[in-house]
Amino acid sequence: MPRRPSSGRRVLKHQPLTFSPFMRLLSFASMARRDLSHPEDCQCSDEDISFDEKQKIPNLPRKGKEEQVSDSSDEEDSQEDVQADFEFFDPKPTDFHGVKILLQNYLDDKEWDLSSFVDCILEQTTVGTVVKVADDEDESVFALVTALNMARDKDNKCFRELKEFLRKVCSEKNIANNLEMLLEKKAQDVGLLVSQRVMNLPPQLLPPLYDGLFDEVSWAIEDEPTEKLRRSFRFKSYLLVTKIYKLKNPKQRKPRHGEEDIEDTVFLKPEDELFLELSSWSFTFPMRSQLVTSQEMKNYQLMGLVMAVEANKIPKFRQMLNSLID
């Protein structure tokens, strides 16, 4: 179906985003090399990519090109500069392996029908975006954002397993009831917001990514060919499953003389801090799978974070995210 035209074009200057003393480090961290169940099937590259502080990105709130140009001449910069043109695309079947790589630890180390979950994402072409590098022969997927109705595919094995996983890791009884409501009784009004990407993707891509997602949701409510489909995008709540780092022993860890304050929580994705601030409820759980990290993160544990955000908070989120990145 044809996209509605969007207006406006802005050029932003890329600067590393810092939410904690470690966030600059994390923003340039290499994507951890992880094993696939069928590695021979994967045609996507996970080569390390780094970006310098003077890169500029035209900000397009629609599918199209997000140009990333490096013009750094700082010889003392230890990061290798790479010139890349990012483009936003509708999901398509050939993105299967790239999306599967991004999502392989989405439910920690649980064995589940991830392939069917990826299929659900790729079949929904009117809402959702994948980010690639222009003219990349491998068509590696660097980012994904989409929103899936929790009831539309409720009979799919992957959604049954996802719900089972969330119930199992939710140990807080007062929140378990709220979670159950979104998983079952109110599922038709819930969008599972899936956002995964390589860790060093420039943060300036975030506002157009999320603006595009929520614009597409609004358009789908009006433009989908059947009332059933239009109804499936009238989300009242969004459910998010993501990851953060938590300090292992916060009460015992005190900054030494001359050190910066130690953060209890490090957000791998800066927008997750905004979602958490706006959430109606949330809970964390320890993860058995661990990302490859630096020495600076040795005192932190990777945790899963599940949160619910009411749809009426999304305009505020978009405003906060744009202000943050600008």
From Swiss-Prot:
GO terms for cellular component: nucleolus
InterPro entries for the chain: BCP1_family (IPR025602)
Pfam family, one: BCCIP
Residues recorded with modification Phosphoserine: S45
Renumbered residue ranges of the record's region Disordered: 37-81
Compositional bias (Acidic residues): 72-81
Keywords assigned by UniProt, alphabetized: Phosphoprotein
Family from the record: Belongs to the BCP1 family.
PANTHER family reported in the protein's UniProt record: BRCA2 AND CDKN1A INTERACTING PROTEIN, BRCA2 AND CDKN1A-INTERACTING PROTEIN
Name this protein carries in UniProt: Protein BCCIP homolog
Organism: Arabidopsis thaliana
